């Protein structure tokens, strides 16, 4: 190819191109050598290896520390809890799981106190962990919050840091243990009036009412117990009973029939508290609450029977329910309880209240007396479980029944037994027993046949009481 250059100029250009090629090759070589040297230097690999090492080191250190603290038998000093806060805030999921579980175990075993948790600033990190996407972390932190909520100071801290809403969210969780721990925490937050008001304001009542229908018996118990605590304050009743179509009362009546004894017992307690409201009572009677109640009163479980008889005595205080209770055969159930060998002072005392209430209506007096309730009351007087207070309660009931003129004649077969107890009460040094015995005698003497059965020992004891009273009167005059 003819370039028009002479041989000399063409050679000069050729030499220049060769020099440039040599320079380029040397530059590339030098560049490769530089990059290789840079990549082999530890200063450029430091951040990556450090980050990897940091995560592994944190996890290993956390596990070692937490495993060691779990084996410590004595309560931990607050200084040993300082690492927990840092570990709770870790971005490593395994560290969060291990830390929250360890803290839950320490709280459960009373190795750390709620005050220590507050002091070390761990309440807020725990509440943040409630909002984790990991169910294990949610379970563990929920258990921690539930245990903390048993303390007054911790309850206030949980509320002030916005812990109610996360707990209500977790109470709707599909994970059974997450839900269980959240409802447990809500229950403990109802243990003080102040925190309870905040719960109700944040919408806890509908959530707790819905949880009564849970398939988890512990969730049922926690939610029912929380509702019982809330029901202790009548100002919350409108919200509780305002859930449509008597939802709460129906759910509680269903829970009364639970095979889990403590759940049925708690349902009776909650209904008893709510039944102080006349409107609630009308709804309960309309829902035939007396039918399941009859079975529970005869339960072989003493706590359940006591809870049921407490509910019955509360229902009987309202005039609207008395006839219905008699019509469903409640007096027969009471008779069986009195004549049975399984009873307690609580059962007897509430039976007495029920008998007095049912007999206050004229049409029920004969029903009460013609049943074997009177025989049962007399039998209860000599029961081994009968305390002094119970004896006084039974005697008051007998005195009440005797005050009805038209039923005194029904007592005639029992005069001898009644007189024995009147004599015992007259010999008692407590004035209240003596006064009750004298009042009962006054009512019995309305029947002319009663004077025939009065014993000489009874008359002598009356004279002694009169003499004691006279001496007391004379001494008082000298003051």
Question: Where do the protein language model's features map onto the residues?
Answer:
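Alpha-helical solenoid repeats of the armadillo/HEAT superfamily
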Residues: 91-105, 133-149, 160-161, 173-191, ...
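Buried hydrophobic core positions in alpha-solenoid tandem helical repeats
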Residues: 83-85, 125-127, 166-168, 186, ...
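Intrinsically disordered, low-complexity regulatory regions
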Residues: 1-86, 91-92, 100-104, 430-431, ...
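Residue-level signal for cytosolic alpha-helical hairpin/rod architecture
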Residues: 81-82, 100, 111, 123, ...
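C-terminal per-repeat helix/turn "cap" of leucine-rich repeat
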Residues: 116, 122, 129, 157, ...
């Amino acid at each position: 190819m003819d370039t028009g250059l002479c041989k000399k100029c063409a050679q000069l250009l050729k030499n220049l191109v060769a020099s440039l090629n040599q320079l380029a090759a040397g530059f590339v070589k030098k560049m490769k050598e530089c990059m290789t040297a840079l990549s082999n230097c530890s200063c450029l690999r430091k951040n990556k290896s450090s980050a990897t090492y940091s995560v592994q080191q944190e996890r290993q250190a956390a596990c070692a520390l937490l495993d060691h603290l779990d084996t410590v038998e004595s309560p931990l000093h607050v200084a040993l809890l300082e690492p927990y806060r840092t570990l709770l805030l870790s971005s490593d999921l395994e560290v969060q799981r291990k830390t929250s579980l360890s803290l839950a175990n320490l709280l459960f075993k009373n190795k750390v106190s709620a005050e220590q948790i507050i002091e070390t600033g761990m309440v807020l990190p725990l509440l943040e962990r409630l909002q984790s996407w990991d169910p294990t972390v949610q379970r563990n932190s929920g258990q921690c919050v539930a245990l903390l909520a048993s303390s007054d100071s911790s309850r206030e801290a949980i509320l002030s840091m916005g812990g109610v809403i996360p707990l209500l969210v977790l109470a709707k969780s599909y994970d059974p243990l997450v839900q269980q721990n959240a409802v447990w925490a809500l229950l403990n937050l109802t243990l003080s009036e102040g925190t309870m008001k905040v719960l109700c304001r944040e919408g806890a009542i509908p959530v707790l009412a819905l949880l009564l229908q849970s398939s988890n018996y512990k969730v049922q118990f926690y939610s029912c117990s929380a509702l019982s605590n809330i029901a202790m304050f009548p100002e919350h009743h409108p919200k509780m009973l305002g859930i449509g179509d008597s939802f709460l009362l129906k759910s509680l009546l269903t829970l009364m029939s639970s095979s889990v004894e403590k759940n049925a017992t708690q349902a009776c307690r909650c209904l008893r508290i709510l039944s102080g409201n006349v409107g609630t009572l009308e709804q309960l009677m309309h829902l035939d609450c007396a039918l399941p109640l009859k079975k529970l009163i005869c339960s072989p479980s003493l706590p359940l029977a006591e809870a049921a008889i407490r509910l019955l005595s509360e229902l009987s205080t309202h005039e609207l329910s008395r006839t219905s209770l008699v019509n469903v055969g409640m007096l027969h159930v009471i008779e069986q309880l009195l004549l049975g060998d399984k009873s307690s002072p609580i059962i007897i005392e509430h039976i007495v209240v029920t008998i007095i209430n049912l007999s206050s209506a004229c049409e029920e007096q004969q029903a009460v007396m013609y049943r074997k309730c009177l025989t049962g009351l007399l039998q209860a007087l000599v029961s081994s479980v009968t305390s002094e207070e119970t004896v006084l309660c039974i005697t008051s009931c007998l005195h009440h029944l005797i005050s009805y003129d038209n039923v005194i004649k029904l007592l005639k077969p029992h005069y001898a037994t009644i007189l024995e107890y009147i004599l015992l009460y007259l010999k008692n040094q407590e004035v209240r027993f003596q006064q009750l015995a004298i009042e009962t005698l006054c009512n019995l003497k309305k029947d002319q046949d009663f004077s025939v059965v009065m014993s000489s020992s009874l008359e002598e004891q009356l004279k002694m009481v009169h003499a004691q009273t006279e001496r007391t009167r004379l001494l008082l005059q000298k003051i």
